[in-house]
Regions:
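N-terminal extramembrane/targeting module of integral membrane proteins
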Residues: 89-90, 384
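N-terminal entry motif of extracellular EGF-like repeats
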Residues: 52
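Structured non-transmembrane domains adjacent to transmembrane bundles in polytopic membrane proteins
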Residues: 58-80, 90-188, 416-604, 608-610
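Short secondary-structure junction/hinge motifs that connect adjacent elements
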Residues: 29, 83-86
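Membrane-embedded transmembrane helical bundles of large multi-pass transporters/channels
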Residues: 1-49, 115, 137-139, 151, ...
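Short coil/turn segments at secondary-structure boundaries
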Residues: 82-83, 402-405, 453
């Protein structure tokens, strides 16, 4: 017997040394990759595309119109109006001195030098287009429409876009020139708004990432009550983000995928949240197995065997949902699909290779002060989750009916969610200079001044098209684009004709990016196409309208496909059609309830005007794909226990042993997405709240009460059509 014991110990020692070397090699490989990934973090912002082309539908009429409109200017790309607004006593009849000062300023502004590039501002604006001050009828405002050449201004200087620096320079210069004269200045319009968006996205690189890491670290310290253990899952999550960022950077640099600041922000919180979730699951199972195995190598082998299936199934579910975004009309949505999928794949890879290696290297002491000993102590059904399990076991019908009714009540409010889209001025949680300027502009000029609807028509149709468009109730004026006198640089009365076509500018009475402005587009298109079906309607309002329409189309197409894919994955994982349908139904109910709560909170607490048209789709992708994770973690363990002790005991045992870790995982994911709220962007703040609340709802109510109670009520038939359905309850 002693010889057999010695032989067994020798074999165990050989296996242990082999596992130790594998762990060391794994860590070295990850550290090597991390060295390459570090450079990608500092350069990722240089491959972002945050202009309208990053969101525009490829097949939209506004896209086609934009391609034609380029031919009417010497610039290679779209011109972005920067609206310089001056407010005060600017009536030439009563304050000729101030009016003349504005004239002189507009004549000399473009000759000033941008410090960052040491080039004159004229380099970045439309060539041959003078800055002409336009006084308001009430004499209290002057508007200067400066056409920014985005093809030039979008260049990078020292790794940062020069475009926002131009707007910042003009804002500071105008303030310096006019504040002493009692004149208030703003830079608004598309260029001003996008500069503020760039500034908001710029904080994603540092502020968002740092805050997320701090929040995750605090939660891990609270969960593990250990001064050292929290470092391993956090290091693993950071490593996963490093490799994901590196891959995304190189793919975006080669223009294989689209990346914008919004997508990068989502990538950061998604990877840190998902990787930490998977790490919590592995560490909990490893700690459990350390009680049953003297060798930490054997404990890790059994733990990996227990978690690899739910982690891969969970990650595959999220990846499947994200990759369906490739069917989107919007290039920004299509970009999120592969970017998010790379993040989830990196998270799974790190947790299943790097984290086990780290845990093996450090041994049991890493759990100090609560070091798990080899004592073969089974999980006792005690504590909070034992009480929850007993409640579900005693009164399953009362539990699932009450929770389902509560969810249905909140789901009823989902119909009140305003998802008609946000104007650019409503996109910020703070009042930026561009937002204030846009509001003040509407007080003194037609709201659409400086950002007209741009209509491409055949020269022969110009008169009839202008008349038809002018009859649209929201159109203030319609004027044609004319040539510029090369000597005076002033517009002439001669039409600018390119390939037999001309451009009409329709100024709206309403804000061009408002709901009313976007609703004007189908009316203008209808009026114009009655004259000639080949007329193209573009401009900022048309772009906004086309983006909203594509978002609604994506909701109709993508959501059903995602549901079908998740149902198939669940069916294969649980070997049960019934269980898959049940889990999917509960998560959809949870999603609807979350939308209902969002409708109430956004309107009555945060005071948001509504949501972006893409919000329901993004919320659905993350809530359903991530929300189903916790049911996967629960039900795979329930199935494992049901094979041993029956479905009734299995659901109680599964709930009890997974309750703590799943709730912790949900808290981490909710916190990481909640961090999106620190950014001054309404869309990300709303998405962060929706995912955070929805995940907590899933972990605390759906996974803890609704699903276990339903499974307890249904019994072994939940496993239909597998053989497990015939097992005694």
């Amino acid at each position: 017997m002693s010889q057999e014991v010695l032989s067994e110990k020798k074999k165990s020692g050989v296996k242990g040394r082999k596992a130790l070397w594998i762990a060391i090699v794994s860590i070295l490989v990850w550290l090597s990759i991390g060295g390459f990934a570090g450079g990608a973090f500092s350069k990722i912002s240089t491959v972002q595309e945050n202009d309208n082309s990053a969101f525009l539908p490829d097949s939209a009429e506004s896209t086609i119109a934009g391609e034609v409109l380029v031919k009417f200017s010497s610039q290679d790309d779209q011109l972005f109006p920067a609206l310089l607004l001056l407010l005060g006593d600017l009536n030439p009849a009563t304050n000729a001195q101030a009016f003349e000062k504005v004239n002189q300023y507009s004549a000399t502004l473009l000759s000033k030098t941008l410090p960052e590039t040491e080039k004159p501002l004229s380099t970045y604006f439309a060539q041959g287009v003078p800055l002409t001050p336009i006084p308001s009828a009430d004499g209290k405002a002057i508007l200067i429409n400066a056409q920014l050449d985005f093809a030039v201004a979008d260049a990078n200087v020292d790794g940062e876009p020069v475009f926002p620096k131009i707007i910042e320079f003009i804002r500071e210069d105008m303030e310096k020139e006019f504040t002493s004269a009692g004149i208030t200045t703003h830079v608004t319009g598309p260029a001003g708004l996008f500069a503020d968006l760039f500034e908001a996205f710029g904080s994603i690189d540092t502020r968002l990432l740092q805050t997320t890491l701090i929040v995750v670290a605090i939660i891990l310290i609270v969960v593990y009550r250990s001064p050292v253990l929290w470092i391993l899952p956090l290091f693993t999550a950071a490593s996963a983000l490093g490799i994901a960022t590196m891959i995304v950077y190189y793919l975006a640099r080669e223009e294989i995928i689209d990346l914008n600041g919004q997508t990068q922000g989502i990538l950061d919180v998604l990877v840190l949240g998902a990787a930490t979730d998977y790490a919590l699951l592995l560490i909990a199972r490893y700690r459990e197995e350390l009680h049953h195995h003297q060798s930490r190598f054997d404990a890790m082998r059994i733990a990996l065997r227990g978690v690899v299936e739910p982690i891969i199934a969970s990650g595959s579910t999220v990846i499947a949902g994200l990759m369906v975004l490739l069917l989107s009309d919007l290039s920004s949505n299509r970009g999120l699909g592969p970017v998010g999928s790379i993040g989830i794949a990196s998270s799974m890879l790190a947790v299943l290779t790097l984290l086990p290696a780290l845990l093996i290297i450090f041994g049991r002491w890493i759990f100090w002060p609560k070091i798990p000993r080899f004592d073969d102590v089974d999980e006792k059904l005690s504590g909070l989750w034992s009480k929850v399990g007993n409640l579900v076991d005693r009164r399953p019908r009362a539990v699932w009916i009450s929770t389902a009714l509560a969810l249905l009540i909140f789901a009823g409010f989902s119909t009140t969610l305003k998802s008609d889209g946000l104007s650019q001025s409503e996109a910020f949680t703070t009042r930026t200079d561009s937002v204030i300027g846009l509001e003040r502009l509407g007080e003194h000029f037609p709201s659409g001044e400086g950002t007209p609807v741009e209509i491409v028509v055949d020269q022969a149709d110009i008169a009839s098209a202008a008349a038809a468009i002018g009859r649209v109730s929201t159109v203030a004026s319609v004027v044609p684009l004319t040539n510029v006198d090369p000597l005076t640089q002033r517009p002439t009365s001669e039409l600018k004709v390119v390939d037999g076509k001309v451009v009409l500018y329709a100024t709206l009475k309403v804000a061009p990016d408002s709901a009313e402005g976007k609703e004007s587009i189908p009316l203008i298109r209808q009026a114009a196409k009655a004259v000639n079906p080949n007329i193209l309607v573009g401009g900022q309002s048309a772009i906004g309208y086309d983006v909203d329409q594509s978002s609604r189309r994506d909701n109709r197409v993508i959501i059903p496909i995602v549901l079908l894919l998740i149902a198939v994955i669940l069916g294969f994982l649980l070997r049960s059609i019934f269980a898959a349908a049940l889990l999917l139904g509960t998560v959809v109910l949870s999603f609807a309830a979350t939308l209902g709560v969002c409708a109430l909170v956004f309107d009555n607490v945060f005071g948001f005007a509504g949501t972006d048209a893409a919000f329901p789709l993004f919320a659905f992708i993350f809530l359903v794909a991530l929300g189903i994770d916790y049911n996967i973690f629960l039900m795979t363990r329930v199935r494992e226990e049901s094979l041993k002790i029956g479905t009734r005991a299995g659901i109680i045992k599964g709930l009890t042993v997974t309750g703590g870790v799943i709730t912790s995982a949900g808290t981490v994911l909710a916190a990481t997405f909640g961090v999106l709220g620190i950014l001054p962007l309404v869309f990300l703040a709303e998405l962060g709240f929706a995912v955070a609340f929805g995940v907590l709802l899933d972990t605390i109510i759906v996974r803890s009460l609704l699903v276990p109670a339903l499974v307890r009520q249904i019994g072994p038939k939940i496993w239909w059509p597998s053989k497990l359905q015939h097992q005694e309850n």
